[in-house]
Regions:
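Short beta-strand/turn micro-motifs at beta-sheet edges
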Residues: 72-73, 161-165, 231-236
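Short, conserved micro-motifs enriched in small and acidic residues
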Residues: 101-112, 123-124, 191-195, 352-359
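Acidic/histidine-rich catalytic neighborhood of metal-dependent amide-processing enzymes
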Residues: 112-172
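Phosphate-handling active-site elements
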Residues: 84-97, 117-131, 204-213, 372-374
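Buried hydrophobic positions in well-ordered alpha/beta secondary-structure cores of metabolic enzymes
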Residues: 32, 49, 62-65, 114, ...
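Metal-dependent amide/peptide-bond hydrolase catalytic core
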Residues: 174-374
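Acidic/His- and Gly-rich active-site-bordering loop/insert found
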Residues: 1-102, 319, 373
Length: 374
């Protein structure tokens, strides 16, 4: 009996996984067991299952995640996406084809599609692994713990059925400016860290024009944005410290270590000798997600397109694919979109996916896996 991806998806969207993934992981394990596989859950909370062919061959991994961002949005089936009038989306309305709810596209729709391929693909040689992580939306401790030695990764995320071969990385940290505290009535006796924020912000603005990596062929220019600023302890005191939090969206070949060293040196050069600064990354258990780019002419990308995937393009958000791309060619693919013409979709109250796209994504990944492991 064929795997019922739409029934699985409907139940998955109705299973909250924004605070704790235990219930959703239990449902996934039960589904895998019911289909005759023997899943395991490792110490990092990853759900793993494997199928093997009759001969040696490549190892392909299907990966996505089961956690969602809060709050939980209830399940609903409808003919059109939320906030879209009949016919205005450019697709003919179909009764009940649109599933609304938190996680419907990010990433329970992609999960249903990957499960279809995992269960239904004919494997003649090599190995197919399903690896579903528990906390992609926060620290990616599950993905960071995986060591699968694969030859290719297909990562399930909402790409509108396009095959995404690249994505920017994301780093976050705080620039701390240190001055000299003094009475506000005698400002010349101190060195204001808050006043120094002005040239530092200018230096942040100029960083990519003078120091940063060149424009990437597909990902374009990196971005560097100050997002939070904080400083001062008393209203009548020259502040000795000011902190600026920055968000970095990187492109290859920039690395986490290289960016830190270059940014700190660049910003320091804009300060007078009476002040100093330092830059520290925000503390987290796992490495930040680095930028990656799989060649557009790689076998994995070509196979996905031949199977029916859409255009080759970058993915619009940071993803755990970053960890896997260090080891093997990696693409991001799945039903649903991050945003449509009417606004945000993933991580938003309007989150939805089309059931027909979930089915089509499953067909595409199944065909690609059969080509790679046939």
């Amino acid at each position: 009996m064929a795997f019922d991806a739409l029934s699985f998806h409907e139940t998955a969207v109705q299973t909250p996984s924004h605070e704790n993934v235990s219930e959703m992981r239990e449902f996934l394990v039960e589904t895998l067991e019911a289909e005759g596989t023997a899943p395991t859950v490792d110490d990092a909370g990853n759900t793993l299952a494997t199928r093997e062919g009759d001969a040696s061959g490549p190892h392909i991994v299907l990966n996505t995640h089961i956690d969602t961002v809060p709050p939980h949005v209830p399940f609903e089936r409808r003919a059109t996406p939320p906030g879209v009038a009949d016919g205005s989306s450019g697709q003919r309305p179909r009764d009940g084809d649109v599933v609304r709810g938190r996680g419907s596209c990010d990433a329970k729709g992609p999960l249903a599609a990957l499960l279809t391929a995992f269960f239904e693909a004919d494997i003649e040689a090599g190995r197919l692994t399903l690896a579903v992580t528990p906390d992609e939306e926060v620290y990616s401790t599950g993905a960071a713990a995986l060591d699968l030695e694969a030859d290719g990764f297909i990562v399930g995320e909402p790409t509108g059925l396009d095959v995404c071969n690249a994505a920017k990385g994301r780093f976050e940290g705080t620039v701390t400016i240190e001055g000299v505290a003094a009475h506000a009535a005698e400002p010349g006796s101190g060195a204001s860290a808050i006043r120094a924020a002005s040239p530092v912000l200018q230096a942040i603005e100029s960083y990519d024009e003078t120091v940063g990596p060149p424009e990437h062929d597909s990902l374009g220019r990196p971005t560097l944005e100050p997002t939070v600023i904080d400083g001062g302890e008393a209203t009548n005191q020259i502040p000795a410290e000011c902190r600026i939090t920055i968000d970095r969206r990187s492109v290859p070949p920039e690395t986490q270590q290289g960016f830190r060293e270059q940014l700190e040196a660049h910003l320091q050069s804009w300060l007078p000798d009476s002040l100093s600064l330092s830059f520290e990354y925000t503390e987290r258990e796992t490495p930040f997600l680095e930028a990656f780019a799989t060649p557009a002419d790689s076998e994995l990308v070509n196979t996905m397109q031949a199977a029916g995937a859409g255009e080759v393009r970058p993915f619009g958000a940071a993803t755990e694919a970053s960890y896997f791309a260090e080891d093997a060619p990696t693409v991001v693919f799945g039903p649903g979109v991050l945003a449509d013409n009417d606004g945000a979709v993933a991580h938003a109250e309007r989150e939805y996916v089309r059931r027909s796209d979930v089915e089509r994504a499953g067909e595409i990944v199944t065909a690609a896996v059969e080509d790679l492991l046939g």
